[in-house]
Amino acid sequence: MARYLGPKLKLSRREGTDLFLKSGVRAIDTKCKIEQAPGQHGARKPRLSDYGVQLREKQKVRRMYGVLERQFRNYYKEAARLKGNTGENLLALLEGRLDNVVYRMGFGATRAEARQLVSHKAIMVNGRVVNIASYQVKANDVVSIREKAKKQSRVKAALELAEQREKPTWLEVDAGKMEGTFKRQPERSDLSADINEHLIVELYSK
């Protein structure tokens, strides 16, 4: 499945919630009727079956983190193999992706922008360049911007925007040095309550 390259707001409208694909800070512009489905007048939303609700939740989370279908299914399989709650394990794996950590640290205004920084070799982990967006960041890993990328206006703009966001408690960021430490995996209480990972587990458990 190819990565979606169309309008970002359309995806958020389809899922009925702000996926933070367009802006890393402010909610979607009020001109965008988030509760209205895509289309000139917004298609009437049919009443979903249990399967439909589960599928929509999976699509929402997958799009939020910018993960393709096969990747997402593999994350679920890995989460199911790990000890503990499968749904929480899944979210921890998604949060541990390098592109997501770069976004959470404020180096990218969106996850897509953070992914681009990674692929363009602008990101280092423990002093070594890593250009794989799905790289799993571990506890106490230090993520930083390469020296030659520190002058990029988009990085500076992203850091300014990040000042308006709530600081993740599982990260420690030095904006001046443009580096941060992944102190620990986030706990479920640290993450958005808007995600219902139990629906995803139910979907894949069938």
Curated annotation (Swiss-Prot):
GO terms for cellular component: small ribosomal subunit. Keywords: Ribonucleoprotein, Ribosomal protein, RNA-binding, rRNA-binding. The keyword Ribonucleoprotein applies. One of its GO terms (biological process) is ribosomal small subunit biogenesis. SMART domains: Ribosomal_S4, S4. Residues 96-156 form the S4 RNA-binding domain. InterPro entries: Ribosomal_uS4, Ribosomal_uS4_bac-type, Ribosomal_uS4_CS, Ribosomal_uS4_N, S4_RNA-bd, S4_RNA-bd_sf. GO terms for molecular function: rRNA binding; structural constituent of ribosome. Belongs to the universal ribosomal protein uS4 family. Part of the 30S ribosomal subunit. Contacts protein S5. The interaction surface between S4 and S5 is involved in control of translational fidelity. One of the primary rRNA binding proteins, it binds directly to 16S rRNA where it nucleates assembly of the body of the 30S subunit. This is Small ribosomal subunit protein uS4.
